[in-house]
Structure formats: structure tokens, C-alpha cells
Swiss-Prot record:
The family this protein is said to belong to: Belongs to the G-alpha family.
Organism from which the protein derives: Pisum sativum
Keywords: GTP-binding, Hydrolase, Lipoprotein, Magnesium, Metal-binding, Myristate, Nucleotide-binding, Palmitate, Transducer
Gene3D superfamilies with a match to the protein in the record: GI Alpha 1, domain 2-like (1.10.400.10), P-loop containing nucleotide triphosphate hydrolases (3.40.50.300)
Keyword Hydrolase: yes
Protein name: Guanine nucleotide-binding protein alpha-2 subunit
Domain notes per entry: The helical domain (69-189) is required for self-activation.
Source domain of life: Eukaryota
């Protein structure tokens, strides 16, 4: 509407400078509007802890200039917070198990570590965390290596223990160095809940050159209280990239410990599929955290999740991993085709096996996504 008005406006002959400025502004607006039409919007959605924000960070590393030193340093307090919060969760979890579990003895923290544990638990309760010094790192290492804490860590799925735990606990001496600057790997493991909306613009890199497509990717808060903020992004979206952490079939939500994470993911996926504004939107489903899934499935049966209660294991080892993965994949396919006819050509649906922390996997996946969306665009233009 603004463009139409500006084109019809008569410039005053008495002020050539003002006329020139107005004409330049009009040219810029028109240019930006045309450029915007060529940018495809991707909406990155998923429940909390699905790994979508790690995907977002990988895009920045893969298809942009990455993180400069200032950005890397900005993650230092986040990483320290992850360390302190995690060791507190493990300490407090061990104490609870020592009181209530049938095998309570193995969760009793050793006398040598008790005082350290209480100190670190208190630090983990603060609003402001101290700088991670060598002395504090040594104390955290001592508690981490305690047998009771290791037994508790083995039951991390019951205690909201984050996926980054082992990585940071094994790098404490480096993290506590006086001149510490987070690495790209540290940033990828750093856990901070997305609130609100963040965006990034990129063009995927193929084997020989950049794709001709330009994408704007929006990452939206995954926790329940963030979802009401999504609605203004829905219109005009080329595709939804939905992240589902398939390894979390035996875990509960951070914000509601009575709710299984995969059940929440199922319900969220169903809800998104039913939104009228996604009637013709393509869906790229990332079955994420496969690296954790393939280890867990050999020890924790898939049917502990209500959604997968009809699952029947077939064997062990790699064959069982693939069988379980295909079962989960089929469940998501069934959800999708409940809302979309299988023979529809105006709405693309693809499923990808992903590990957000694996840069090669993410790069390959986005190359495939790019190819899929480019083919869809050619089809819509009548060129296929």
C-alpha cells in the first residue's frame, strides 16, 4: 500500500533536493521489497530440548562467518551456568535417591565429597554464578568422580540432567583456564533456553557453490509458554523444520515433569499440522539426537513411552537400532498423513535422521532440504 501511494505522489517542483531524496527512498523501498520476495522463510519449531537451537548455531557456523571472539566470549557465563546447574542437579538427585531408592546405599555420597557437594549445590542455587576457577573446577571434578554421582548420572533421564553434562565435566580444566575463550564445540554444547524469536539469513553451500536460494530461518522458543508468540510468523512461511528429539522417549519435560517429552512432541506436531496457515506449507521433519538414541535404545526399551507401547523389539545391536528408528519414523509419518493426503503435490513432507552436534550431518541435511525446496519452487513455476 505504501509503494502504491508513493508512486502516485506528485513531487513539488520548488524543492529539487527533497524530490531527489524522496525518489531515492522510493527506489530503495521497491528494491528491498523485490529482494524480500526472493527470500524463503523457514520456521524452526520443536518442543523444549529438541536440539533446534543447536541446529540454528550450526547454520551460523556452516553458512555464515561463524562466531567472532566477542560472540564466543559471550557464551562463557552460559557455560559456567551449565556446569554449576548440572553438578547441583546431580548432587541433589543423589541425595534424594539415597533417601528414597530401594538400592539407596549406592547413592550415598562419600564422606570426602559431602562438604564439597553441599558447597557446590549452594553455588548452583544462586542467581549469579562465580567465575570457574581452578580450585572450583577441581572440586567439581572430585564430586563428579564420586561413585554415587556416577550412579546418579546413569539415571539422568529421571533428573533433567542435560545432554551437555559429560562434555563439560570432561573439560573442566580447560574451561577454568584464566584465558579461557569458548570453542565452537563449547558453544554448540552450551544449553540456554530460547525465549522469543531469533533469526538468521543464509544460503546453503553445496559441493561446488552456494545455492541460488536465500533462506531466512526463525528459531522460536520451544517451551509451552513461548508458543503463543509464534502466530505472527506463520503466514508466508515456505517450510516448517520441525525438530523431534527421538532420544527423549523416556524423559519428562523441564517445565512439567508429569509429561513425557515424546508425547509432548507428538501433540505439538499434531497441533502445528492442523493450523490453517500451514495448509500448503512444506514440512521437513528432523528426527534429532540420533547419536543418543542409538545408544539408549539398547538399554531402555522404546515402549516405556506411551506412544510406542505397541513396539516389539526384534533383536539386538545395529539391527535393533534401525528397527526402532523406523518404528518411530513411521509413527510420525502416520501423524502427518492424518492431516494431508499422500498424493498431494503442493505440500512436501520429508524426514531426515539428524544429530545436531554433528556438523557434517547438518550440512548434508540442509543440502537435501535446499534441493527439495528448489524442486518445489520449480514445480510451482511450471518448470517441472
Amino acid at each position: 500500500m505504501g509503494l502504491v501511494c508513493s508512486r502516485n505522489r506528485r513531487y513539488r517542483d520548488s524543492d529539487p533536493e527533497e524530490n531527489a531524496q524522496a525518489a531515492e527512498i522510493e527506489r530503495r523501498i521497491e528494491s528491498e521489497t523485490k529482494a524480500e520476495k526472493h527470500i524463503q522463510k523457514l520456521l524452526l519449531l520443536g518442543a523444549g530440548e529438541s536440539g533446534k537451537s543447536t541446529i540454528f548455531k550450526q547454520i551460523k557456523l556452516l553458512f555464515q562467518t561463524g562466531f567472532d571472539e566477542a560472540e564466543l566470549r559471550s557464551y562463557t557465563p552460559v557455560i559456567f551456568a551449565n556446569v554449576y546447574q548440572t553438578i547441583k542437579v546431580l548432587h541433589d538427585g543423589a541425595k534424594e535417591l539415597a533417601q528414597n531408592d530401594l538400592n539407596s546405599a549406592k547413592y550415598v555420597i562419600s564422606d570426602e565429597s559431602k562438604d564439597i557437594g553441599e558447597k557446590l549445590s549452594e553455588i548452583g542455587s544462586r542467581l549469579d554464578y562465580p567465575h570457574l576457577t581452578k580450585d572450583l573446577a577441581k572440586e567439581i571434578e572430585t564430586l563428579w568422580e564420586d561413585a554415587a554421582i556416577q550412579e546418579t548420572y546413569a539415571r539422568g533421564n529421571e533428573l533433567q540432567v542435560p545432554d551437555c553434562t559429560k562434555y563439560f565435566m570432561e573439560n573442566l580444566q580447560r574451561l577454568s583456564d584464566a584465558n579461557y575463550v569458548p570453542t565452537k564445540g563449547d558453544v554448540l554444547y552450551a544449553r540456554v533456553r530460547t525465549t522469543g524469536v531469533v533469526e538468521i539469513q543464509f544460503s546453503p553451500v553445496g559441493e561446488n557453490k552456494r545455492s541460488g536460494e536465500v533462506y531466512r530461518l526463525f528459531d522460536v522458543g520451544g517451551q509451552r509458554n513461548e508458543r503463543r508468540k509464534w502466530i505472527h510468523l506463520f503466514e508466508g512461511v515456505t517450510a516448517v523444520i520441525f525438530c523431534a528429539a527421538i532420544s527423549e522417549y523416556d524423559q519428562t519435560l523441564f517445565e512439567d515433569e508429569s509429561k513425557n517429552r515424546l508425547m509432548e512432541t507428538k501433540e505439538l506436531f499434531e497441533w502445528i499440522l492442523k493450523q490453517p496457515c500451514f495448509e500448503k506449507t512444506s514440512f521437513m521433519l528432523f528426527l534429532n539426537k540420533f547419536d543418543i538414541f542409538e545408544k539408549k535404545i539398547l538399554n531402555v526399551p522404546l515402549n516405556v513411552c506411551e506412544w510406542f507401547k505397541d513396539y516389539q523389539p526384534v533383536s539386538s545391536g545395529k539391527q535393533e537400532i534401525e528397527h526402532a528408528y523406523e518404528f518411530v519414523k513411521k509413527k510420525f509419518e502416520e501423524l502427518y498423513f492424518q492431516s494431508s493426503a499422500p498424493d498431494r503435490v503442493d505440500r512436501v513432507f520429508k524426514i531426515y535422521r539428524t544429530t545436531a552436534l554433528d556438523q557434517k550431518v547438518v550440512k548434508k541435511t540442509f543440502k537435501l532440504v535446499d534441493e527439495t525446496l528448489r524442486r518445489r519452487n520449480l514445480f510451482e513455476a511450471g518448470l517441472l
